[in-house]
Amino acid sequence: MKIAIIGAGNLGGALGRSWAKAGHTIIFGVRDPVGGKTKPPLGEIGASASSMVVPDAVRSGDVIVLATPWDAIPDVITAMGDLRGKIIIDCTNPIFLNAEGSLSLSLGSSTSGAEEIARLATGARVAKAFNTYGWENFADASYPGYGDLKPVLFYCSDDDEAKEIVEKLAKDLGYEPVETGGLGMARSLEPLALLWTRLAVRRGRNPNFVWGMMKR
């Protein structure tokens, strides 16, 4: 699969490296394809990765993965061009520092970042996934000592094909994908990301932790 990852920072780079190891072709969509942030991941991935300006990456990819900061999204969506029929996996979170210095969600509970992206990206098919953990857990999804229990990857979408792609890409990383419903469920997944961030950043925990699902 040709995966166009928009953004080559910590998250985009970690996803790109791991998916390349699983046999996918990675295209980083960035403002500066020659230098900047793409050099480290390109150097590590090798021939199965390339970098292009954002609209070219969008045209070349079978699926688009958004791995940019949330506040860049309006400009990024504009730069992506025609998105009709395209599948977009939104990995972003609308998290910001409020006036008290606490991490908060900027959109409240009446909508979500994923729904706003779907509104901006006319005609695109949007899924929310790969947003509930820090990048470290996508660089390496192995957690010894838990037997056959795999970390879970919660996702949501209104589109069946988008769901199938997320399922495959999650399994390729070593996760157990768990569908939570339509795109409106991003209103629950984004607060879950906020909880993870508060625990990892504000409570000083090691960021190498994920959610598991115990069944009986």
What are these model-derived regions, one by one?
Residues M1-E44:
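NAD(P)+-binding Rossmann beta1-loop-alpha1 motif at the extreme N-terminus of oxidoreductases
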Residues G23, S60-D62, A124:
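Short, well-ordered alpha-helix to beta-strand connector turns
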Residues I45-G101:
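Rossmann-like NAD(P)-binding element
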Residues S51, R125-A129, V178-T180:
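General beta-strand structural signal in soluble alpha/beta enzymes
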Residues A79-G85, A121, G145-G147:
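Short, conserved loop/helix-junction motifs that constitute active-site signature segments
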Residues C91-P144:
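Rossmann-fold NAD(P)-binding glycine/threonine-rich loop
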Residues D148-R216:
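Active-site-lining helix/loop region of Rossmann-like oxidoreductase modules
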